Amino acid sequence: MVVGDFATKRQLVIIGGGPGGYHAAIRAAQLGLEVTLIEKEKLGGVCLHKGCIPSKSLTQTAANFSGLSHYKQMGISIPEANFEYETFTNYYSSVVTGLQKGVEALIKVNKIEHLTGSASFMSGERIGIDSGHHFEMYEFEHALIATGSNSLLPKQAKLSNRVMTPHTLWELKELPASLVVYGEDYFALEAAMAYKQLGSDVTLIIPADGFSLDSGIEKELLRVLKKNKIKVFKNHQWESAEETADTVAVTLTKDAEEKVSIEASHVLFAAGYSPNVEGLGLEAINVERDENGFIAVNEHSQTSVSNIYAAGDCTIGMKLASKAIKQGKTAAEHMSGLPSAFNLSLVPYVVHTNPPIATVGLTEEQAKSEGYEVKTGQFSMSGNGFASILGQKEGLAKMVIDAKTDVILGIHMMGAGAVDMIQAGTYALEMVAREEDLAYPVYAHPALNEAWLEAIESVSGKAIHVPPARKKEKSTV
């Protein structure tokens, strides 16, 4: 290893080339900063290589495969279809490669210095970079930590080709005959439904009582899981896993007494993450962290050390690429002198199940616990004309509203188009929209978003496609 004799000066040094890191790098370069981006693996991070892109390739493939029966109903004759796992892995790998090349090209065209290696803080103004055969020192005005997180695994379990986490799932070479999924977040739900629809026998273990979604959505989700013949165990905690040549036996406990053993060919543990901060030298800068090691930041993405910022999964809060992107760009703008800030309460949460789930703002339960007097409106997708055309009538749309001010507090949907439509809900909450603001506009017809119109009108009992007996009150209009 060769050690450099001097420190290269940079206005911004970023550690981590995932969504938070590379978005921040490009935004900072756009604003005129000299930027060095350090990534020890491949640009794009977990999201591109082991998370968002592979997982959504999986869920989209499963949705397409399970939807083939509807084509026959529409008069389209299709020979018997088969799912080939190897072809699928080649497909998503090609998608990942294409997107990675795009990120690399963007970094280059924005004249961002990209270094491959491991970085660690020497002080509050210096970072050392070890490339394996060379060590360099950089002196920075600002630094951004965007190192992401890693999937946790219970102490009683060891990673193998049968015991997997969300980050190692993509090493699978064939479709599991049977799969136990342990977890309650979006990844657990997506994997459970996708593998079931592709042909695996799936059991979903939830360590809590639910999925932290609105009660209306949870009820519909459990119905859909049951319809798909996915076995669900609530309030069961992981105790151990014993692997044989062909199977894995998972032992679970409930109420610290009842024990259940479930056997499957494969197990996916998707319950918890730890921040990737080991070896970063955080002790040299003394940034504030929580009890699990996640970095605390303010609304500008600043840590407790004002010239050091952090973004994404290594920070406290949701583990979402959308959060990382917003935090990364906010950090770049703020250190450039702009008054940029973010509000994590308005980050949309999406689950690419079939049908998909999308939500933003407060659930009915959260709103009540925060002291709001709440009124709600709900509409089933079975009453939506375009959903019927698509053959995707499962799901519902729900509005949560402050009864005193008519301000919309939360928008929740499970159904076709939910992920694309939720952005309009984010706009509504950002602008502090009221009930009338969603009820007044003309909605295209036939369209999936008419479910939102029906849901908002059902708040006051004016929904057209809700039978009178189900309306909350009679209209006075």
Question: What are these model-derived regions, one by one?
Answer:
Residues 8, 15-20, 27-41, 53, ...:
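Flexible, glycine-rich terminal cap/loop adjacent to redox cofactors
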Residues 52, 145-205, 231, 283-285, ...:
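Glycine-rich dinucleotide-binding loop and its adjacent helix/turn
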